[in-house]
């Protein structure tokens, strides 16, 4: 796409709880002028397209329809939420092999359509599937993006905001690493309206050190808590995806925590996709924002990346995946 293009087209692949919530977010936030929805359950996509179209009189004009893979050919953005859902007691990394097979089939068909836009991946394990989308598509790394730690960082900011009594939009803090159990909080750069969190807490005494540890654990494990209560998470990630979509379609050059390709931005972290802040616009990732990590944070980044890299290497050692890799 070009930064000045007026008609912006999104194709969503995967019309489950996350996908349909994302589609709803696009409609209510007036994002994009065209939305095609693909799923193996065709009647579901037809029903959702019809249902969503009934909201347009309250929002803004938009073409919404049940799409085919051939419709991807002129899309600006393809959003991948298709995959087996995470079950109670299951980690995101437990999903690897079955969702790699789904990812391979989906990406192959999208590329065959002539698609030349940007991939945004949200299916879990998102860092692994963003990497596999890059491998299977042959696309430049800048045009394959994962939702990464966007939701985790939002949860982190909201949790801190609730504790200290400010608007979450005034809290600037990131979760980095895997979107999953090995993620970590970048405490060294967390701030409230420009005041370092450490200084803020000294001045206001809103929470002690153990409270901060407990807060991070609640953020890291939030998905498990929600899955145990209602079976799946979808509203938060849907709005996170809508935010990323807007940044891309409107060429915002926004800084967002995403799953982006690693080629030595951090010592010992290479050839994987992992969560870190990045500038994103109409052409995908403009460049990663390499927050200087302290020694403890760097070790956590390296450990998180190693866990992902080991899984990637094991998966792509298998002929069924290695044989179709283009990158």
UniProtKB/Swiss-Prot annotation:
Summary of activators and inhibitors of this protein: Allosterically activated by fructose 1,6-bisphosphate (FBP).
Which amino acids does the record list as binding NAD(+)? Answer: 18, 39, 44, 69, 83-84, 122-124, 147
Query: Is Cytoplasm found in the keyword set?
Result: yes
Instruction: Return the GO cellular component terms, semicolon-separated.
Output: cytoplasm
Question: Where does this one sit in the cell?
Answer: Cytoplasm
Q: What is its main location?
A: cytoplasm
Sites where the protein binds beta-D-fructose 1,6-bisphosphate? 157, 172
Which leading EC class covers this enzyme? oxidoreductase
Q: Which UniProt keywords apply?
A: Allosteric enzyme, Cytoplasm, NAD, Oxidoreductase, Phosphoprotein
What does the record give as the reaction this protein catalyses?
(S)-lactate + NAD(+) = pyruvate + NADH + H(+)
Q: Does the keyword Disulfide bond apply?
A: no
Active site location: 179
Q: Please list the residues that carry the modification Phosphotyrosine.
A: 224
Give all cystine bridges in this chain: none
| Enzyme Commission numbers on file | 1.1.1.27
Fetch the Pfam families from UniProt. Ldh_1_C (PF02866), Ldh_1_N (PF00056)
The pathway this protein participates in, as annotated, is:
Fermentation; pyruvate fermentation to lactate; (S)-lactate from pyruvate: step 1/1
Q: Which family does it belong to?
A: Belongs to the LDH/MDH superfamily. LDH family.
Please give the subunit comment from the record.
Answer: Homotetramer.
**Known PANTHER family for this protein?**
L-2-HYDROXYCARBOXYLATE DEHYDROGENASE (NAD(P)(+)), L-LACTATE DEHYDROGENASE
- What name is this protein filed under? L-lactate dehydrogenase
What organism does the UniProt record list as the source? Answer: Streptococcus uberis (strain ATCC BAA-854 / 0140J)
Q: Output the lineage of the source organism.
A: Bacteria, Bacillati, Bacillota, Bacilli, Lactobacillales
